[in-house]
C-alpha cells in the first residue's frame, strides 16, 4: 500500500468543477511538486488531501486512512499559503508553545539549526520579522512535531534567494530522513532542486505525472530573436509559432530549427543577427504560471 492514494478524485464548488477525476499514488519518502497555472486546482487538491474540503467524488487515503481521521494529526503537518503566525507573541514564546504541544518535539538546538535566527530575532515579536523570515518561521513551526508527511502550499513565497536556498537545504535533509513531502511551487529552480516527481495540473485535470529530468529531456522548442526585417520571410513559413514583435526585434518559436535556419540563411540572415535559446516543456509550464 502506498502512503498516499488518490483515486478518481473530483471536487465541485458552487456547481463549478475544480478537480476532475484525479488519480495518483505517492510512496513514503517521495518529494512531489504540484505545478500548474494559477487556478489549476493545486490548493484545492491539498485541501482535499488534508480533509479541509469534502470530495464530490472519488477517494483519498493517507496511511490507509481518510484525511479527516484524527490518527493522522501526529504524523501530518501543513504549511498553508498564508502564514498563521500569532504576531503579538515573541518568536521564542511561539517556539516554546509549539514544543510543549508535541511529546517528541525538536530540541532548541535543532530549531536553531533550522531557523538560523539571532538571539535578537528570537526575542522580538513575530510581527517584526520580514516576509521571508515569517515564512521560514512558519515552516519551522510545522516541523517541530517531527511530522512524517508534509503538505506545503507555496512554501517559499516572500523569501529572498538566500532564504529560499536554505529552505531547499532543509527539504533535502528531510528527504534523507524519509519524510514525505507534497508541495506547490511557482519556482522552476525549486522544483529542479528538490522534487523527485512532478504532478502537473491544468484546469483541474492531472495532465502529467513525471520527473524533472524527464521533462527536461523532452523535445525542445527553439526560440529565435532576429531583426524585424525578416518578418516577411517568417510569414511564409508554417512551422513557426508565437511570433511577437517587440521594439525592432522579432521573436518566434519552432520545433524545426534546422529548416527555419536554412530558409533564413537563403534570405540573407547571418548568425550574428540572431539569438537562439532552448525552451522545454518544464520552462513552458512555469512561464504560464508566471502570467
What is the role of each PLM region?
Residues 51, 57-72:
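Conserved ABC transporter NBD signature motif
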Residues 35-37:
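The feature captures the beta-strand-to-loop junction immediately N-terminal to the Walker
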Residues 150-154:
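Catalytic Walker B motif of ABC-type/P-loop ATPase nucleotide-binding domains
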Residues 4, 19-21, 73:
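Conserved structural motif at the start of ABC-family nucleotide-binding domains
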Residues 168-251:
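ABC transporter nucleotide-binding domain
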Residues 221-291:
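Short, charged/small-residue-rich alpha-helical element at the C-terminal edge
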Residues 125-129:
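Conserved ABC ATPase signature
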Amino acid at each position: 500500500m502506498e502512503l498516499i492514494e488518490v483515486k478518481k478524485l473530483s471536487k465541485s464548488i458552487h456547481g463549478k468543477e475544480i478537480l476532475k477525476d484525479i488519480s495518483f499514488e505517492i510512496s513514503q519518502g517521495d518529494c512531489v511538486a504540484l505545478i500548474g497555472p494559477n487556478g489549476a486546482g493545486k490548493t484545492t487538491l491539498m485541501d482535499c488531501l488534508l480533509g479541509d474540503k469534502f470530495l464530490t467524488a472519488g477517494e483519498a487515503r493517507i496511511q490507509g486512512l481518510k484525511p479527516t481521521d484524527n490518527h493522522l494529526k501526529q504524523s501530518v503537518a501543513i504549511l498553508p499559503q498564508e502564514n498563521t503566525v500569532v504576531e503579538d507573541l515573541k518568536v521564542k514564546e511561539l517556539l516554546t508553545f509549539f514544543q510543549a504541544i508535541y511529546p517528541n518535539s525538536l530540541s532548541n538546538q535543532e530549531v536553531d539549526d533550522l531557523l538560523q535566527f539571532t538571539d535578537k530575532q528570537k526575542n522580538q515579536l513575530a510581527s517584526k520579522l520580514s516576509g521571508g523570515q515569517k515564512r521560514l518561521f512558519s515552516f519551522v513551526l510545522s516541523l517541530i512535531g517531527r511530522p512524517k508527511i508534509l503538505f506545503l502550499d507555496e512554501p517559499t513565497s516572500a523569501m529572498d534567494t538566500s532564504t529560499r536556498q536554505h529552505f531547499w537545504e532543509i527539504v533535502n535533509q528531510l528527504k534523507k530522513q524519509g519524510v514525505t513531502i507534497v508541495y506547490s511551487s511557482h519556482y522552476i529552480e525549486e522544483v529542479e532542486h528538490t522534487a523527485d516527481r512532478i504532478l502537473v495540473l491544468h484546469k483541474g485535470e492531472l495532465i502529467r505525472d513525471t520527473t524533472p529530468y524527464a521533462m527536461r529531456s523532452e523535445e525542445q522548442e527553439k526560440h529565435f530573436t532576429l531583426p524585424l526585417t525578416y518578418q516577411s520571410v517568417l510569414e511564409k513559413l508554417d512551422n513557426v509559432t508565437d511570433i511577437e514583435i517587440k521594439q525592432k526585434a522579432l521573436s518566434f518559436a519552432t520545433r524545426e530549427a534546422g529548416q527555419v535556419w536554412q530558409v533564413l540563411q537563403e534570405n540573407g540572415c547571418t548568425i550574428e543577427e540572431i539569438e537562439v535559446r532552448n525552451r522545454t516543456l518544464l520552462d513552458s509550464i512555469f512561464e504560464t504560471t508566471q502570467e
